[in-house]
């Protein structure tokens, strides 16, 4: 079984530098989440500095939430550089399936090479050419049985680790599927929570193996959400408490509170 506590301890000890090419909505949010966890964030989008930044970073996170032609060029270049320099890359295909541009961009990055792909049911469906399941940047449908199948199929198709988020999260390496049962309904009332998970995944995969990282980032974030919800009953306070608990959680806490299992598909 995956040791989430050990994975968290490695992040805290090594404080990896995570290079984020992310969207306008969540830059501040994800930077603060990484700092609270114990990692170091950098948000760099200019194509002219990408090679220097990727070279010094421990991992790269590409989030397609607010696209334009300049950012797309930077994302493609960052993916190529991550591959060249052997840096793990996390892809968050925000809103894939909602527009052709988003789906095309996500697939371009994915085909260059992504270590981990994290998305909701609709976004991951779009990567297999299934349409009509993404509304804006949120998934309009969720089928737990199909989510398991999607995680396995996309992981196998693109030789990557896939995390499909939802009421239950499913993570696969193309052979096994892990279910993560942690979380809280207030996560759906705060923008950018999925983007935070992608950023945290970047921190974990900088110092852990990809499958462990994908599972551990979900568990740590969702246990933090559970603890935050014990102290906050509405979205504003809950959001602030999320940062507190990303900072306060110990490896022992997450080992005790994790709810994961290997499931059959």
From Swiss-Prot:
EC supergroup of this enzyme: transferase
Coiled coil ranges: none
The organism's place on the tree of life at top rank: Archaea
Cofactor: Mg(2+)
UniProt keyword Kinase, yes or no: yes
Any one GO BP annotation for this protein: thiamine biosynthetic process
NCBIfam families (alphabetical): PRK09355.1 (NF006830), thiM (TIGR00694)
Chain's role: Catalyzes the phosphorylation of the hydroxyl group of 4-methyl-5-beta-hydroxyethylthiazole (THZ).
Family in the record: Belongs to the Thz kinase family.
Protein name per UniProt: Hydroxyethylthiazole kinase
Gene: thiM
